């Protein structure tokens, strides 16, 4: 997304006079990181040529505003809701945060289909005993997969009584294989899987099932339905829709979600998910045990909360709120901070 930060400036140089909006899907860096860029002021000045800038989270918007106040002269900020107004010289733009989402109804309905039920049956045939812990990520260093594998290894070390009663299914979707660092990451992941399976595998039980390919939609939803625990622990993520997809597809409402506090989804789902620091291997290990031992009533209570949040703030809400921000006449038309994601 950062490739498009100065697109508005380029468009206006060509004579474009219509309003231009921009949405940043990735996190906006905090001041101490952004300050290191040689072109920091130029980037911010270019972004001020947009009429509306949208971010995923309140934290991202705060980071951007802090950078504006530090590197752009005479900036004033008005408003205190979901959408603010920023003035710098003769420019006035709107800055909002709009957590992107999914089509909740589509996932929920498809998860209840016969096709997905058949996929779930085959998964149960392949992993007939114990609970399934699911990780689904594209191949990327930001996803924290090696940390996650180490956390699962720690869990197995601490809880030998649960061997044969729990299995981690780690799906890795191929990405950027032509870049050496990604190929190195793949090798690291596969070596870790091999080491852990080598230590703990017993007759009739392999602790980690590693899948390196893209899944079809029915396959993916089949895993969402069968997994009692979703382990979503990116080191940093703009949003992470896997967490929302898992909630929408959990038709029995018995799943537990372990979620990185550094995922953009965390503020929205924190009342139902078990939040963890993905760098803290022991904390994630303990979270796996907490999720494994959680009683069914608490699972349902937590999942219902998360499903309600995702259903209310779905992809159509995201589109409508962004479009409203570009056309509404008054900042008071927008909900106060905390309505979308508690702070």
Q: Where do the language-model regions lie?
A:
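Catalytic cores of carbohydrate-active enzymes across secretory and cytosolic contexts
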Residues: 1-343
């Amino acid at each position: 997304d950062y490739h498009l930060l100065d697109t508005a400036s380029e468009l206006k140089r060509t004579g474009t006079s219509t309003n231009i909006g921009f949405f940043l899907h990735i996190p906006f860096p905090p001041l101490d990181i952004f300050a290191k860029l040689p072109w920091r002021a130029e980037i911010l000045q270019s972004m001020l040529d947009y009429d509306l800038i949208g971010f995923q989270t309140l934290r991202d918007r705060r980071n951007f505003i802090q950078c504006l106040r530090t590197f752009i002269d005479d900036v004033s900020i008005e408003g205190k809701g979901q959408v603010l107004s920023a003035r710098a010289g003769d420019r006035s733009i709107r800055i909002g945060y709009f957590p992107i989402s999914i089509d909740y109804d589509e996932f929920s309905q498809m998860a209840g289909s016969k096709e997905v039920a058949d996929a779930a049956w085959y998964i149960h045939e392949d992993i007939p005993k114990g609970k399934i812990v699911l990780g689904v990520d594209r191949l990327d260093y930001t996803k924290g997969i090696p940390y996650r594998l180490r956390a699962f290894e720690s869990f197995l070390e601490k809880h030998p009584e649960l061997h044969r009663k729990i299995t981690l299914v780690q799906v890795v979707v191929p990405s950027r294989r032509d870049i050496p660092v990604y190929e190195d990451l793949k090798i690291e992941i596969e070596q870790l899987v091999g080491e852990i399976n080598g230590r703990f595998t017993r007759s009739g039980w392999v602790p980690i099932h590693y899948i390196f390919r893209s899944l079809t939609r029915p396959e993916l939803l089949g895993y969402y339905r069968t997994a009692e625990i979703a382990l979503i622990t990116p080191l940093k993520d703009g949003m992470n829709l896997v967490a929302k997809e898992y909630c929408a597809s959990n038709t029995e409402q018995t799943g537990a979600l372990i979620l990185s506090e550094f995922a953009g989804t965390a503020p929205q789902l924190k009342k139902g998910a078990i939040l963890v620091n993905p760098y803290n291997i022991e904390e994630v290990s303990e979270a796996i045990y907490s999720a494994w031992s959680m009683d069914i009533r608490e699972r349902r209570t937590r999942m219902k909360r998360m499903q309600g949040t995702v259903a209310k703030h779905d992809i159509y809400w995201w589109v409508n709120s962004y479009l409203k921000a570009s056309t509404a006449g008054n900042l008071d038309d927008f909900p106060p901070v905390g309505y979308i994601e508690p702070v």
